[in-house]
Amino acid sequence: MDSRTSTEYNNKTQTVFAVAVQSQSAKKAILAALADEEITKILDSVMYHSKSIVDITSENNIPHTTCYRKTKWLLNEGLVIVDKIIITPEGKKFSLYHSVLKSINVKYESNNVIVEAEQNFDIIKKTMARFYSLE
């Protein structure tokens, strides 16, 4: 089920597609993520731009180990992806993370939790471009 909403953005009206999440495990993961203050900070931080753990921790005052642990959980639940892996001139490797969702709407109706999520099409386009550019 799709629900469409029109929004005004930079003087242009655009249609936003929010998809109802059907999977119970995905619903639980989204609700658990929203209930955790540090995870919501991480999601907010990587919603529009890919960032490293170092960037996320410095922007949000989250302890380094906590940020790694919670980002790993988000990866396992499919709420963020590794957008890019960077190797420094010194040979160190680090990942840049990006959220797969742009917005989440949760409502409770008649003993039923309804979770709607808008996919982050920017990251989907970027991933598809990389996939199709492989020869």
Where do the PLM segments sit?
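N-terminal leader segment of winged-helix/HTH proteins
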Residues: 1-30, 87-88
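Short, cationic-aromatic polyanion-contact patches
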Residues: 27-36, 52, 83-108
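Basic amphipathic alpha-helical segments that dock to polyanions
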Residues: 56, 67-74
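Amphipathic alpha-helical dimerization/coiled-coil segments
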Residues: 101-135
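Hydrophobic, well-ordered secondary-structure scaffolds
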Residues: 18-25, 43, 53-55, 66
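N-terminal helix-turn-helix DNA-binding core of bacterial DNA-binding proteins
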Residues: 29-62
